[in-house]
């Protein structure tokens, strides 16, 4: 059986929920319920509301996804 293709999308974290779940507003305006990928969890990457993230989603259920990358934000010192 072939592995399914995942859909990559970008958005902004709008809400932090219990058990490392997040609500993300995608660039197209959709709301997605997401969790953190294992590699990000293992490397202690912290995600806060307002962060820009990359989300992977299955083509079968576009309302749920996995956060795979947090984009760097420009700090005031740069």
Curated annotation (Swiss-Prot):
Transferase keyword on record: no
One of the Pfam families matching this protein, by short name: eIF-1a
PROSITE patterns assigned to the protein according to its UniProt record, in alphabetical order: S1_IF1_TYPE
One cellular component (GO) term of this entry: chloroplast
Gene Ontology MF terms in the entry: ribosome binding; rRNA binding; translation initiation factor activity
Keywords: Chloroplast, Initiation factor, Plastid, Protein biosynthesis, RNA-binding, rRNA-binding
Subcellular location as annotated: Plastid, Chloroplast
Residue ranges occupied by any S1-like domain in the UniProt entry: 1-72
Disulfide bridge positions per record: none
Keyword hit for Nucleus: no
Subunit organization: Component of the 30S ribosomal translation pre-initiation complex which assembles on the 30S ribosome in the order IF-2 and IF-3, IF-1 and N-formylmethionyl-tRNA(fMet); mRNA recruitment can occur at any time during PIC assembly.
Family to which the UniProt record says this protein belongs: Belongs to the IF-1 family.
Described function: One of the essential components for the initiation of protein synthesis. Stabilizes the binding of IF-2 and IF-3 on the 30S subunit to which N-formylmethionyl-tRNA(fMet) subsequently binds. Helps modulate mRNA selection, yielding the 30S pre-initiation complex (PIC). Upon addition of the 50S ribosomal subunit IF-1, IF-2 and IF-3 are released leaving the mature 70S translation initiation complex.
Protein name according to UniProt: Translation initiation factor IF-1, chloroplastic
Organism: Huperzia lucidula
Lineage, opening ranks: Eukaryota, Viridiplantae, Streptophyta, Embryophyta, Tracheophyta
Recorded name of the encoding gene: infA
